[in-house]
Amino acid sequence: HNDRAGEIGRTLNTKDFDLDRIFAKEGVQIIHLSGLISALSEETCNFCLELARAAKKNGTKISFDLNYRATFWKGRDKELRSAFTEIASLSDILVGNEEDFQLCLGIEGPEAGGKGIEEKIENFKEMIRRVKKTFPNASVFATTLREVVNSNKHLWGAIMLEGSNWHVVNPREINVLDRIGGGDGFVGGLIYAILKNWEPKKWIQFGWASGALATTFQ
């Protein structure tokens, strides 16, 4: 269950922002859009679409974390599939696992998840090969790899395709205090590394470390 009725974020509107200043005059390098916000309401769906269009028009790179949530999509599949597909077609960086790509974008692929980390890696690679054919504008695809041992012990890794090169941070054990925010930390670290013009293998390493820090920091 997810009750967000009355949340101020549901009313986000591009009319409240100076998009010309943000994208044209100040030249934002990357804008990150979340599938959670995109699916939050009809207003936020349009908000993210308009941001993506404005960013593309002005040469700003677009990062999109699909972040599928069944409670947000209930009864809205057609509307959200159309919006997510357009945003993904404009995006340079796509973040999500097999389930996200299947349910948000309708890309057929292997069964989400897998029995172990190695199978998850192979499933993700196969999915991205298919996604690239549908969304050729994107050049970076990434996701985290998580295997829960127990509530406080996880194996945490990450995988990324940049251009034609795969980069993997092999899962290692981390002591988790609160798993919430690990994915956001990962994306934040990934984007930071890209903005710093580090070599691609460091993008995924810094994203991994940022996500690990977010879940283990007291």
PLM regions: where:
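Conserved phosphate/ATP/ADP-binding segment of small-molecule kinases
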Residues: 71-164
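Hydrophobic beta-strand scaffold residues
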Residues: 62-64, 95
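Anion (oxyanion) recognition and catalysis
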Residues: 49, 53-57, 88, 208
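Conserved post-catalytic alpha-helical subdomain immediately downstream of the catalytic base
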Residues: 167-218
